[in-house]
């Protein structure tokens, strides 16, 4: 119920949660009312386009999942990629912060099929004499994504079996990172946050 209420406040279904407008101090001169009306109309169309894109995508479902992780576990990681938003639960990533709580490094872990990766990988040698590579879990490999703040920019790449995956290096400005490390209640000096459920942990234990 709490996740649903937070979802409605963050992404209301029939209302835009943001507004595009021009700051008067950035224009440099007064513009006529006709031009301002045309600008407002164009911005309104852009707002509707964004809302239609969100409605057609899977972003609402992913954000709702992240909210539930925040309420219970206090932590979630979102990646805003070209194909939509991806949620990483706490058991799929680690984060390193400085003393002020600023994120410095992120490492994520995923299981991805060898066929999806699209380049040759060494086949692991089984410890037994039985061929375990046919149709088993060995078809999936652990892919790690390493994200680091370097010289004022976020840089990241992906690795598998200690090899960097080709064409996975990317970067973004510090102020426009697609990696969002979320916490419900931030605790000073700690790497991870606390969830809403933890506030009632004593009451929950007494119910047992």
State where each predicted segment sits:
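Extended, helix-rich architectural segments
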Residues: 1-134
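Structured, contiguous alpha/beta core segments that scaffold functional sites
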Residues: 72-73, 79-208
